[in-house]
Design a protein with these regions (language model features):
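Flexible, glycine/charged-enriched surface loops at secondary-structure junctions
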Residues: 2, 44-48, 89-94, 115-117, ...
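Signature of multi-pass transmembrane helix bundles
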Residues: 109-252, 417-425
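Early transmembrane hairpin of solute transport permeases
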Residues: 28-127, 131
Length: 425
């Protein structure tokens, strides 16, 4: 059995990470910040400046904002949040936007009231919303987490200043307690009632948007094409539904997703494949619940080394967790689960993140293919030897090294990706 402190921390991590969000999380964060700033200002802004870190710009530039009438870009997210967002709804801040709000947003965008500036900051998730109306001004800063307001100033008066927080301390539960052995023990022994509500919400929400992605018109229709092109086997069903969910989300669908590590795509990738597998295999609900607990915590564990935003594609981490979760559901012992992780990370640790967009769905499909291959290799007793490439003696060490590559080694890559994305022909 786990120490009570570890048990409660893991429950806390799941509750903090597995929250509903509507649309891609970076534009939603901007909309939330703008809605909060407008609330402090107390009136409609006449001028707005959005100062954004490079990773915020990268992840907002190409993605459709939900409930916007298919608008894209930082200006649209900020202005829509300012005129029609409800900050009390957190990551669902745009869920109540109506036609009047969309119309007013377009009017203000036509007047070009919002300008965007690159914020030179060592913090990858960092932006400042500045608003002005008449003689009144507001500046609101968000850092580290998508709705973590660290500073608010109105008319030169500081209303809030909590910049002592970091990415690690802006949340309550202690993520440093995460490790593979305890994650497995927790998944095996957790009281189902302690996690049932959040797990069932993830199943319900993420499968709903998966089916919407299969039937609706979003992006390239990748889910349908996968289903129609390949044999109707387990992997095809997992890849098609998971990719469809991502494509719908990136394509502006207003249905909520239960996220993981601040990302809807990661929440989708670490859950939908397991749900499909469990239903196809007709496994009991409790087996799926425990596997989803395992997969979600394994995703968080990997991301604590990489950070919420980087040049490293988060679909790899979440798909790696999904593959390990399938091994867990298939009765694999911890040693076999570790082999699944190592086999995945030996294959696809080099996928870059070039921003949130509909092609994220294709990256998820490719990553799941690698993860399912890793699962089958491990279940057949096969794994790559330690020190094959970046692999270490233990899967936990390999996860740490991959995180080091993503967080430190790819910093210059991240800058170059942003430079290329911002080039104009």
């Amino acid at each position: 059995m786990l120490d009570e402190r570890i048990y409660e921390s893991y429950i806390g991590i799941l509750k903090e990470e597995m929250v509903p969000a509507m649309g891609c999380t970076e534009p939603i964060a901007l909309a939330y910040g703008a809605a909060r700033a407008r609330e402090v200002l107390g009136k409609e802004p006449e001028h707005i400046t959005a100062k954004c870190s490079g990773n915020i710009i990268k992840n907002v530039r190409c993605v459709i904002i939900p409930n916007s009438g298919e608008l894209t870009g930082i200006e649209a997210g900020v202005v829509l949040g300012a005129v029609a967002g409800d900050p009390s709804l957190n990551m669902e801040v745009l869920s109540k936007v109506n036609e009047s709000g969309r119309k007013r947003c377009c009017e203000l965008l036509d007047k070009k009231i919002c300008k965007v500036e690159l914020l030179d900051s060592p913090v990858v998730l960092h932006f400042i919303i500045e608003m002005q109306a008449g003689d009144d001004t507001v500046s609101l800063e968000i850092k580290y987490d998508h709705i973590n307001v660290t500073k608010t100033v109105k008319n030169q008066e500081v209303l809030l200043d909590s910049d002592h927080k970091s990415e690690e301390t802006s949340v309550a539960a202690d993520r440093t307690l995460l490790n593979l052995e305890d994650i497995k023990t927790f998944a095996d022994t957790v009281e189902i009632d302690d996690v049932k509500e959040i797990i069932e919400n993830q199943i319900r929400s993420n499968m709903a948007i998966a089916h919407e992605g299969m039937t609706g018109k979003y992006g390239l229709g990748i889910g349908r094409i996968i289903r129609e092109t390949y044999s109707n086997d387990m992997l095809t069903k997992m890849r098609s539904l998971t990719a469809a969910a991502s494509e719908a989300r990136m394509g502006g669908c207003d249905m909520p997703v239960v996220i993981n590590s601040g990302s809807g795509n990661q929440g989708i990738a670490c859950s939908v494949p397991l749900i499909v597998y469990a239903r196809e295999m007709e496994l009991p609900d409790y087996v799926l619940y425990r596997a989803l607990v395992f997969s979600n915590l394994l995703t968080v564990y990997q991301k604590q080394y990489i950070g919420k935003l980087s040049a490293f594609c988060g679909a790899v981490s979440a798909s790696c967790a999904a593959g390990a979760g399938i091994t867990y559901m298939g009765g694999g012992e911890l040693s076999v689960i570790k082999k699944t992780i190592e086999n995945t990370l030996a294959n696809i640790p080099g996928i870059i993140c070039d921003g949130a967009k509909i092609s994220c769905a294709a990256k998820i499909a490719a990553s799941l293919d690698a993860a399912f291959l890793a699962h089958h290799l491990a279940m057949n007793g096969q794994s790559y030897a330690p020190y094959t490439g970046i692999l270490k003696e233990e899967a936990g060490e390999t996860i740490s090294c991959v995180g080091q590559i993503g967080k430190e080694g790819m910093k210059e890559t991240d800058k170059e990706i942003l430079r290329i994305m911002l080039e104009r022909v």
